[in-house]
């Protein structure tokens, strides 16, 4: 629905098209479907309960397939409880290697070593700094630390054309270090980028770190992920648990394992409500089934 949205909407309502691929625009009230039979939700963890229920309400008997590398606690709990069917794709693409993951306290020496090693083998680097207010200062620091690096900045508050140019420069290797926010979490596939450094990884969620880590290692080259943190005393206990789990789960296809740990850390959410994480207090699965 990104191109010619009005024409696409009319075609869907009239049944003139068999497949409609869209963003959240499909949730608009003006979108109607003549005979909706199958709904596929990609990156399911990025949708809220209300959004998913809105999609289901488009037709009472629609078949729904949700896809995600890391199911949110509520969805995983429903699958493990037998309320939803679950299938796991555990076989990685050919020649893919697991991403070596390191959790370290941030030092200039570590940052310089990680970036320099990637650049020396002709690769590219993502440097995640999820604070727009200070991202330009961070980019300048990296440029001063590694003068040979060609550094660009990308974040969601940039003008669309400016951001497109940045991503084009990085994709075509006119730049080799992208200092960015979590805007790269999905939809980015650059095989030559095989090192990602996440500053203040303790502030990121478990599924989010896994998604971000998946931006590298998309070819046959060994990829590296550095999760930079402050002193452990500054971090919350849940943050420490998340980082321990993510550093241990390096194997390809580890998303399901991470999701089960996320379920343990955050809780299962509400079966009848809108919370997608959190510990149930008023009702459990057994009582729900009896109801």
Give names to the regions the model predicted:
Residues 1-20, 24-25, 102, 143, ...:
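Conserved nucleic-acid-binding Ia/Ib motif block in the N-terminal RecA-like helicase ATPase lobe
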Residues 19-22, 40, 63-69, 78-79, ...:
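Structural recognition of the conserved hydrophobic beta-strand(s) that form the central parallel beta-sheet
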């Amino acid at each position: 629905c990104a191109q010619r949205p009005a024409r696409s909407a009319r075609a869907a309502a009239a049944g003139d098209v068999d497949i409609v691929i869209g963003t959240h625009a499909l949730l608009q009230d003006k979108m109607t479907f003549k005979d909706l039979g199958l709904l596929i939700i990609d990156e399911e963890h990025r949708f809220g309960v209300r959004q998913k229920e809105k999609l289901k309400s488009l037709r009472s008997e629609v078949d729904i397939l949700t896809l995600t590398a890391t199911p949110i606690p509520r969805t995983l709990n429903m699958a493990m409880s037998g309320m939803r069917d679950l299938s796991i794709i555990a076989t990685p693409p050919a020649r893919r290697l697991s991403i070596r993951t390191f959790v370290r306290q941030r030092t200039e020496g570590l940052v310089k070593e990680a970036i320099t090693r990637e650049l020396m083998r002709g690769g590219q680097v993502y440097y995640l700094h999820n604070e727009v207010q200070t991202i330009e200062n961070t980019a300048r620091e990296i440029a001063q630390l590694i003068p040979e690096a060609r550094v660009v900045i990308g974040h969601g508050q940039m003008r669309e054309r400016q951001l497109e140019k940045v991503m084009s420069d990085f994709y075509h290797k006119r730049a080799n270090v992208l200092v960015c926010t979590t805007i790269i979490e999905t939809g980015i596939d650059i095989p030559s980028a095989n090192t990602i450094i996440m500053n203040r990884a303790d502030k990121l969620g478990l599924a989010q770190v896994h998604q971000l880590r998946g931006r590298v290692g998309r070819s046959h080259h060994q990829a590296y992920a550095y999760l930079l943190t402050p002193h452990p005393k500054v971090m919350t206990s849940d943050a420490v648990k998340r980082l321990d789990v993510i550093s241990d789960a390096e194997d390809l296809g580890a998303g399901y394992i991470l999701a089960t740990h996320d379920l343990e850390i955050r809780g299962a959410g509400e079966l009848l409500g809108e919370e997608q994480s959190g510990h149930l207090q008023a009702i459990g699965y057994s009582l729900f089934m009896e109801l």
